[in-house]
């Protein structure tokens, strides 16, 4: 039987273990041990703030919360707890939006946005979207810093990014509003196709002028020139 799909407004958290891919390629046993350690440390904190662990994606966690403030407070406690841990280092991203919920699965554009925000987090830090920032801006215990307005792959929405600086959490790098390739405005370059088009247009104009003014048909030598005589009406009082 197909489970009912519901829509919910929720805070969405993504976590990711720093360096896990490289570790799993070198030492699978240590990588698996790190996953066990993550569950042991994070799960009790997540449940403390009424978070729902929706999915484990390799070393990443997808978690939802009822409110933005609960998700931020949970993230702060997680990162504060891990400060002394030399093995387990996380990046955390939080966004808020409407998602489709079926059983324990959550889907939607806002889930994708939360995932796209995560790489902008500093190691041991937390990044949040502008929506989360708006919801916690009146709460003095949360300090944030604006990072920028990136273009997120596969995301049509306009997203501002902030980082949490409460509890001495590290701040991520400022984000240029332009993409990496366009950070420095390039000098104007003459496109070869534009140049070719301009030359052809100019040549066509010259040809048209030449044909219009100099290609006069004189006819054959036996032809007698004809003169057109037009009747004119005398509008004056005197005869000419």
Task: Label each region the model flagged.
Residues 201-202, 212-240:
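An acidic helix/loop motif centered on a single conserved Asp/Glu
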Residues 15, 128, 230:
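A conserved hydrophobic position in a structured secondary element of the catalytic/binding core
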Residues 6-8, 87-89, 223:
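Short loop/turn elements that form and flank the Walker-type P-loop nucleotide-binding site
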């Amino acid at each position: 039987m197909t489970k009912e799909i519901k829509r919910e407004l929720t805070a969405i958290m993504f976590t990711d273990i720093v360096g896990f891919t490289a570790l799993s390629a070198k030492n699978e046993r240590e990588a698996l041990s790190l996953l066990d350690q993550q569950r042991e440390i994070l799960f009790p904190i997540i449940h403390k703030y009424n978070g729902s662990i929706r999915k484990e994606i390799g070393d990443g966690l997808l978690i939802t919360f009822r409110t933005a403030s609960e998700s931020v407070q949970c993230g702060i406690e997680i990162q504060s707890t891990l400060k002394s841990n030399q093995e387990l280092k996380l990046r955390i991203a939080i966004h808020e939006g409407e998602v489709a919920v079926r059983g324990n699965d959550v889907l939607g554009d806002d889930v994708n946005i939360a995932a796209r925000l995560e790489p902008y987090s500093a190691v041991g830090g937390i990044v949040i979207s502008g929506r989360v920032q708006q919801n916690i801006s009146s709460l003095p215990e949360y300090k944030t810093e604006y990072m920028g307005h990136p273009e997120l792959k596969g995301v049509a929405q306009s997203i501002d990014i902030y980082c949490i600086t409460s509890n001495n959490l590290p701040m991520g790098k400022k984000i240029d509003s332009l993409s990496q390739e366009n950070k420095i405005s390039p000098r104007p370059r003459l496109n070869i196709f534009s140049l070719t088009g301009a030359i052809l247009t100019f040549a066509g104009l010259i040809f048209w002028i030449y044909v219009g003014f100099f290609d006069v048909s004189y006819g054959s030598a036996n032809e007698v020139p004809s003169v057109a005589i037009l009747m004119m009406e005398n509008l004056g009082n005197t005869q000419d």
